[in-house]
């Protein structure tokens, strides 16, 4: 891989640092962060297994009987059925309400088998490390996450009140795997909107910052992490989401925004948002697999922050710095940013894989 770094200074535009990369390898592993504050790992971990129907409940019993689930750091894992978990949950501790979530689920595949822990190093590690043991569509949720995984070790604090979950899915066409993070991001924004509508609450305008950040009023409230492995002619994709629902730190949260608009309104619940997410995601995923991302583009572009964003790019060519202005038009078929220069030349912009902010590291190539 060959790389040349250059920087850009913008006046009334966004400040971007551009990294030009040349690589012929396809990108099947995409990641961004929702990490937690650093805490020492417990010597043991309790995982509660919960199913929507008798089918998933039998899966839970089988996993417990075989003691099948493991963690990558060799932490001792204790598997508990939902019916046995009463001693883990106190009425006043605001733990994730398993019954409330399961009652909200109306999907056919996603979210019907749930793993919950009051305190967990990483939900992503649970689903990715045990992918073959779990039904496709399984989700892992925790109340406190202290060793979250993120892009280039980025930190996303995960205190109580944050909705933190990871789930599994399978895909066969590796060319569209990088696009799944956009489907997930869109489903999160639509889920929040759906819950607000159902509860008669003011609409919280959650926006997507490409490729996988979620923003409200200019502040980050969430992020998406997608990883994949290839096995038996399928891509095993683990998807992680972190969303600030009821935690005012480290930035802001949905309920803080809601209180600012309507102080007396009912608050959003993590369980309701997660149930609405899987309802939206299952529909979007089926559309995406049947018709491609084109079927979701119009809605996605109404939700993201970048339409017609103008960017000044400085490229270093043979020791000479050349400036170009490009305007973001949308996404390419590969899921990267599509931009046009003032000379009408089309460009594809890629992240460099090194910066916390994707817009401080981009690839630019002519198309």
Swiss-Prot record:
Where biotin binds, per the record, is at: 122-124, 145, 149-151, 220
Knocked-out gene: effects: Embryonic lethality when homozygous due to aborted ovules that had not been fertilized.
| One GO BP | protein modification process
InterPro entries with a match to the protein in the record? aa-tRNA-synth_II/BPL/LPL, Biotin_CoA_COase_ligase, BPL_C, BPL_LPL_catalytic
Q: Which reaction does it catalyse?
A: apo-[3-methylcrotonoyl-CoA:carbon-dioxide ligase (ADP-forming)] + biotin + ATP = holo-[3-methylcrotonoyl-CoA:carbon-dioxide ligase (ADP-forming)] + AMP + diphosphate + H(+); biotin + L-lysyl-[protein] + ATP = N(6)-biotinyl-L-lysyl-[protein] + AMP + diphosphate + H(+)
The protein in question is named Biotin--protein ligase 1, chloroplastic
Query: Which terms are listed as keywords in the entry?
Result: ATP-binding, Chloroplast, Cytoplasm, Ligase, Multifunctional enzyme, Nucleotide-binding, Plastid, Transit peptide
* SUPFAM superfamilies named in the record: Class II aaRS and biotin synthetases (SSF55681)
What gene is this protein a product of?
Answer: HCS1
Q: What EC number(s) would the UniProt record show?
A: 6.3.4.-, 6.3.4.11, 6.3.4.15
Question: Pfam families per the record?
Answer: BPL_C, BPL_LplA_LipB
Which region of this protein is its transit peptide? 1-37
Q: In which tissues is it expressed?
A: Expressed in roots, leaves, stems, flowers, siliques and seeds.
Q: Does the keyword Disulfide bond apply?
A: no
The chain's coiled-coil residues are: none
User: Which Gene3D superfamilies does the UniProt record give?
Assistant: Bira Bifunctional Protein, Domain 2
What else is on record for this protein? The alternative splicing of the 5'UTR of HCS1 mRNA controls the dual targeting of HCS1 protein through alternative use of distinct initiation codons. A small ORF (uORF24) located in the HCS1 mRNA 5'UTR is essential for the AUG choice. The presence of uORF24 favors the synthesis of a short protein form initiated at the second AUG, which consequently localizes in the cytosol. In the absence of uORF24, the translation initiation begins at the first AUG, allowing the production of a HCS1 protein headed by a transit peptide.
Which PANTHER family does this UniProt record tie to the protein? BIOTIN PROTEIN LIGASE, BIOTIN--PROTEIN LIGASE
Q: What does this protein do?
A: Plays a major role in biotin-dependent carboxylase biotinylation. Catalyzes the addition of biotin to the biotin carboxyl carrier protein (BCCP) subunit of acetyl-CoA carboxylase. Can also biotinylate methylcrotonyl-CoA carboxylase. Is responsible for most, if not all, biotin--protein ligase activity in Arabidopsis. Is essential for plant viability and required for ovule development.
Example GO molecular function: biotin--[biotin carboxyl-carrier protein] ligase activity
Say which species the protein is native to: Arabidopsis thaliana (Mouse-ear cress)
Q: Give every BPL/LPL catalytic domain span.
A: 105-289
């Amino acid at each position: 891989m060959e790389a040349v770094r250059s920087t850009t200074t913008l006046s009334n535009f966004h400040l971007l640092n551009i990294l030009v990369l040349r690589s012929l390898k396809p990108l099947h592993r995409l990641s961004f962060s929702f990490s937690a504050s650093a805490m020492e790992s417990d010597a043991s971990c309790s995982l509660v297994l919960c199913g929507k129907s008798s089918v998933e409940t039998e899966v839970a019993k089988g996993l417990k009987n075989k003691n099948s689930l493991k963690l990558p750091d060799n932490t001792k894992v204790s598997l508990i059925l939902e019916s046995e978990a009463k001693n883990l949950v106190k009425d006043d501790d605001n733990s994730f309400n398993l019954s409330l979530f399961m009652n909200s689920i109306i999907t056919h595949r996603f979210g019907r088998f749930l793993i919950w822990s009051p305190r967990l190093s990483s939900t992503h590690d649970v689903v990715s490390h045990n992918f073959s043991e779990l039904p496709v569509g399984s989700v892992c949720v925790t109340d406190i996450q202290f060793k979250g995984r993120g892009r280039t070790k980025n930190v996303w604090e995960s205190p109580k009140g944050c909705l933190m979950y990871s789930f599994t899915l399978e895909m066969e066409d590796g060319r569209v795997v990088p696009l799944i993070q956009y489907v997930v991001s869109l489903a999160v924004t639509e889920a929040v909107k759906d819950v607000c509508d159902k509860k008669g609450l003011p609409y919280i305008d959650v926006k997507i910052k490409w490729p996988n950040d979620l923003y409200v009023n200019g502040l980050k409230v969430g992020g998406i992490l997608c990883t994949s492995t290839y096995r038996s002619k399928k891509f095993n994709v683990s998807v992680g989401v972190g969303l600030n629902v009821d935690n005012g730190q480290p930035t802001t949260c949905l309920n803080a925004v809601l209180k600012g608009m309507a102080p007396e309104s009912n608050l959003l619940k993590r369980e309701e948002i997660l149930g609405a997410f899987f309802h939206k995601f299952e529909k979007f995923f089926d559309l995406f697999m049947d018709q491609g991302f084109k079927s979701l583009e119009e809605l996605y572009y109404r939700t993201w922050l970048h339409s017609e964003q103008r960017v000044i790019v400085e490229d270093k060519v043979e020791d000479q710095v050349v400036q170009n202005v490009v305007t973001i038009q949308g996404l390419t078929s590969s899921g990267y940013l599509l931009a046009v220069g003032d000379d009408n030349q089309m460009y594809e912009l890629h992240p460099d894989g090194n910066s916390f902010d994707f817009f401080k590291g981009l690839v630019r190539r002519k198309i």
